[in-house]
C-alpha cells in the first residue's frame, strides 16, 4: 500500500504506484480537470503523469498556484516549437526556456521571420490549443533520443545532448502530437491550460550567446493562468511602452546613443544635470556614512586581473589594449583598485572598518544584441563602495548599509522593497565555518532591522553570500538594484592585510556594496518610474518664467535672477509668443513649475504659479515660492 498525505492532513491509500493525476481523480473530477502538476514532499515538482512509488506528501498544482505559471510558460515554449515546425518544417529548434513574465524559443532558420510570420505562428498555436490534445511524456533512453533527433534533422538538440555528462542515460521527451521536444519538465498535461498567451516580438540571438557562432531567431512570448492576468500584463506592457526611457530621453533631450559607440552614452546638458544631482546626493551619503571617496585608474596591467581572478572568470567580458609590449585591461569592476589603495600602508585592527567609495567608471564587453538603452550598456559608472573589516564587524556594517539603502530608495520614491539573501553555492571558496558566520551575520543584520527576506540557496557568488535589494516601480515591475556582498577571496589574492590584537597579520573581510549600482541604469529606471515627470529636486529645469508681453520683460529678468541666486535651475522664456503656447510647450516638457508674469504680477511683486500637472496655484510672492521650492529639495 502507498499512503498519500494531502496538504489538509487527510490521507488516501492506493494499492500500488499511483500518478498525481490518479490521486486527483480519486479526490474528485473537478480537481482532476484542474491538475497541472504535483509537488512531492514539499520539494521538486513532477508531471501529472509521473508515478509516486512510496509514501509521500502530495500537493496538487492547479492554475491557482504560483508554481503553475512557470509550467504553463515552459509548455507554451514547446507549443511555439509545434507551430513553427508545422509552418516552417526546415526550421531547427534550439532551446525554449522560461524568463520573467514569459518565455522564448531560439530557432535556426535561413528564412528571416517577419511580423506577419509571428502572427501566423500565434494563430497556429491558437488552433493547436483548440484541438485540446494531451501532452504526453515518455522517459526515453539517451541513444533513442539521439536517433529520434537525427531522424528529424534537429542538429542543435543533438549538440545539447552531447553537452550532457555520461551519467545522463535517459531523459524526458514530451510529445505534442507529431512534435517532440526534450525537457526536465514538468509540463501541462493538456493544451487547454495554454489559452492565455501572446507572442510579443522577434529578436536576434547567437548559439550559446557567442557572436562568433551562427545567428538564431528568438521568438518571445508571455503566458498566464487566465485571460484576466494576460490582459493585465498586456496593459502593463502598454504602460511600459509609454514610459520607455529611450523615447522620454529623446523628447526631453537628456541623452543619446549612436552606432559609433554601441552601449556608450552621450549625455546632453539636461541629462547631465540629473546625473550630477544624483552623484552629489550619493556623495553626501558617502560623507555622512564615513566613506573616503577615491579615484582609481581606468586601465591596469593584466597581471593584477590575473591575481584578482577576473582573468580566469571574466576575461570574455573585458576590453584590452596594448602599449610598449604590455597588455592592459580596461577595468570591468572597481574592487581590485580599492584593494591597492588599502595596501598602501599596514593597518591595525583598530583602524577597521575602513570604507572607500568611488564613482567608478567601468566597461564590460556586453553582446551587442543585449544592449538596451541605458538599462544595458558597455560603459557605466557605479556608486561602488568597499568596506574592509573583521568578521566580527560584518553584522554592524551590513545593518548600517541596510538602513542607509532604504533611506536612499525612499528619497527617490521607492517604498516597495523586496530583500533577498543569496546563500552559498556548491562550488565555493573558503571553509564552511566562515560561510556559516557570514550568512549568520547577514541574517542577524536584517533581523536587527526588523525586515523580512527571502533566501536563495545556492545563488551566492563563489566568494561569499550577499543581500540583494529588489525595487518595485510605479507600474509594478521589479528591478534589482543594491547589493552588499561578503568577499573572503579577494583580500587574500591581492595581499590585503591588517595586524590583529595578537600582532598577527590577517586578511580582512571585504564587503562590496552599491546602492543604486550603475548610474546609467538607475537613471533609465527613474525615467520610466516617473514617466518623465521628475520630482522638483531631480528635474533638469525646475522652473520656467514666462512673460505675457514685453512690458514684463525686466520684471521677469528680476525674478529669474532672484531664483538663480537661490541655487535653483531656472529658465526664462521671453519669446514673442502667446502665453497659452508657452504654457503648453513647457507643460509638455514636464517642467515642474511655470511662473507666469503679467502686469498684475509685476505691480504686486508676485508670480502666477502653475504646475506641470496643470494645477493653478494662484499668485505667490517670490519669497513664498522660494520657500515652497526649498521644501521639495532633497539635496
UniProtKB/Swiss-Prot annotation:
Its EC number is 6.1.1.3. It catalyses: tRNA(Thr) + L-threonine + ATP = L-threonyl-tRNA(Thr) + AMP + diphosphate + H(+). The keyword 4Fe-4S does not apply. Residues 244-535 are annotated as: Catalytic. Zn(2+) binds at residues 335, 386, 512. Its cofactor is Zn(2+). The keyword ATP-binding applies. It is found in: Cytoplasm. One of its GO terms (molecular function) is tRNA binding. Binds 1 zinc ion per subunit. Keywords: Aminoacyl-tRNA synthetase, ATP-binding, Cytoplasm, Ligase, Metal-binding, Nucleotide-binding, Protein biosynthesis, RNA-binding, tRNA-binding, Zinc. It is an enzyme of class 6 (ligase). One of its GO terms (biological process) is threonyl-tRNA aminoacylation. GO terms for cellular component: cytosol. Residues 1-62 form the TGS domain. Catalyzes the attachment of threonine to tRNA(Thr) in a two-step reaction: L-threonine is first activated by ATP to form Thr-AMP and then transferred to the acceptor end of tRNA(Thr). Also edits incorrectly charged L-seryl-tRNA(Thr). Belongs to the class-II aminoacyl-tRNA synthetase family. Homodimer. This is Threonine--tRNA ligase. It comes from Xylella fastidiosa (strain M12). The lineage of its organism: Bacteria, Pseudomonadati, Pseudomonadota, Gammaproteobacteria, Lysobacterales.
Amino acid at each position: 500500500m502507498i499512503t498519500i498525505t494531502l496538504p489538509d492532513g487527510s490521507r488516501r491509500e492506493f494499492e500500488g504506484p499511483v500518478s498525481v493525476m490518479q490521486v486527483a481523480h480519486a479526490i474528485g473530477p473537478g480537481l482532476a480537470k484542474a491538475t497541472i502538476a504535483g509537488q512531492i514532499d514539499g520539494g521538486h515538482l513532477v508531471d501529472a503523469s509521473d508515478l509516486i512509488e512510496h509514501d509521500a506528501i502530495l500537493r496538487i498544482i492547479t492554475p491557482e498556484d504560483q508554481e503553475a505559471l512557470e509550467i504553463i510558460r515552459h509548455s507554451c515554449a514547446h507549443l511555439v516549437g509545434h507551430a513553427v515546425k508545422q509552418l516552417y518544417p526546415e526550421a531547427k529548434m534550439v532551446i525554449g526556456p522560461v524568463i520573467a513574465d514569459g518565455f522564448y524559443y531560439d530557432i535556426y532558420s535561413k528564412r528571416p521571420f517577419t511580423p506577419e510570420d509571428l502572427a501566423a505562428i500565434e494563430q497556429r498555436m491558437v488552433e493547436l490549443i483548440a484541438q485540446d490534445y494531451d501532452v504526453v511524456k515518455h522517459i526515453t533512453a539517451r541513444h533513442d533520443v539521439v536517433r529520434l533527433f537525427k531522424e528529424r534533422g534537429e542538429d542543435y538538440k543533438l549538440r545539447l545532448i552531447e553537452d550532457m555528462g555520461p551519467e545522463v542515460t535517459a531523459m524526458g521527451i514530451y510529445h505534442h502530437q507529431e512534435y517532440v521536444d526534450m525537457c526536465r519538465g514538468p509540463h501541462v498535461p493538456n493544451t487547454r491550460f495554454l489559452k492565455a498567451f501572446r507572442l510579443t516580438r522577434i529578436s536576434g540571438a547567437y548559439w550559446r550567446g557567442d557572436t562568433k557562432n551562427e545567428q538564431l531567431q528568438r521568438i518571445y512570448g508571455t503566458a498566464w493562468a487566465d485571460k484576466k492576468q494576460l490582459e493585465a500584463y498586456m496593459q502593463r506592457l502598454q504602460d511600459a511602452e509609454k514610459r520607455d526611457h529611450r523615447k522620454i530621453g529623446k523628447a526631453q533631450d537628456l541623452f543619446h546613443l549612436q552606432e559609433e559607440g554601441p552601449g556608450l552614452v552621450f549625455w546632453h546638458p539636461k541629462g547631465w544635470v540629473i546625473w550630477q544631482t544624483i552623484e552629489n546626493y550619493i556623495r553626501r551619503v558617502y560623507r555622512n556614512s564615513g566613506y573616503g571617496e577615491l579615484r582609481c585608474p581606468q586601465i591596469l596591467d593584466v597581471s593584477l586581473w590575473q591575481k584578482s581572478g577576473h582573468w580566469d572568470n571574466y576575461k570574455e567580458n573585458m576590453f584590452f589594449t596594448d602599449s610598449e609590449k604590455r597588455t592592459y585591461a580596461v577595468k570591468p569592476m572597481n574592487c581590485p583598485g580599492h584593494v591597492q589603495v588599502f595596501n598602501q600602508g599596514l593597518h591595525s585592527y583598530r583602524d577597521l572598518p575602513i570604507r572607500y567609495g568611488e564613482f567608478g567608471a567601468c566597461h564590460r564587453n556586453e553582446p551587442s544584441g543585449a544592449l538596451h538603452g541605458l538599462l544595458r550598456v558597455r560603459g557605466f559608472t557605479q556608486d561602488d563602495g568597499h568596506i574592509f573589516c573583521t568578521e566580527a564587524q560584518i553584522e554592524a556594517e551590513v545593518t548600517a548599509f541596510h538602513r542607509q539603502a532604504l533611506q536612499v530608495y525612499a528619497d527617490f520614491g521607492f517604498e516597495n522593497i523586496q530583500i533577498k539573501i543569496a546563500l552559498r553555492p556548491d562550488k565555493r571558496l573558503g571553509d564552511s565555518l566562515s560561510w556559516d558566520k557570514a550568512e549568520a551575520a547577514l541574517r542577524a543584520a536584517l533581523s536587527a532591522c526588523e525586515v523580512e527576506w527571502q533566501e536563495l540557496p545556492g545563488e551566492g557568488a563563489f566568494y561569499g553570500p550577499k543581500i540583494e535589494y529588489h525595487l518595485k516601480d510605479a507600474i509594478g515591475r521589479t528591478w534589482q538594484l543594491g547589493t552588499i556582498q561578503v568577499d573572503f577571496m579577494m583580500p587574500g589574492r591581492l595581499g590585503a592585510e591588517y595586524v590583529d590584537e595578537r600582532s598577527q597579520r590577517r586578511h580582512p573581510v571585504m564587503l562590496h556594496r552599491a546602492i543604486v549600482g550603475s548610474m546609467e541604469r538607475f537613471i533609465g529606471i527613474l525615467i520610466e518610474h516617473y514617466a518623465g515627470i521628475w520630482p522638483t529636486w531631480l528635474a533638469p529645469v525646475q522652473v520656467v518664467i514666462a512673460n505675457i508681453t514685453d512690458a514684463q520683460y525686466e520684471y521677469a529678468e528680476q525674478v529669474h535672477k532672484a531664483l538663480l541666486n537661490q541655487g535653483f535651475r531656472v529658465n526664462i522664456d521671453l519669446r514673442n509668443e502667446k502665453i497659452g503656447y508657452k504654457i503648453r510647450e513647457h507643460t509638455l516638457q514636464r517642467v515642474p513649475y511655470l511662473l507666469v508674469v503679467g502686469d498684475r504680477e509685476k505691480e504686486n511683486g508676485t508670480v502666477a504659479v502653475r504646475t506641470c500637472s496643470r494645477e493653478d496655484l494662484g499668485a505667490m510672492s517670490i519669497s513664498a515660492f522660494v520657500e515652497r521650492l526649498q521644501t521639495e529639495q532633497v539635496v
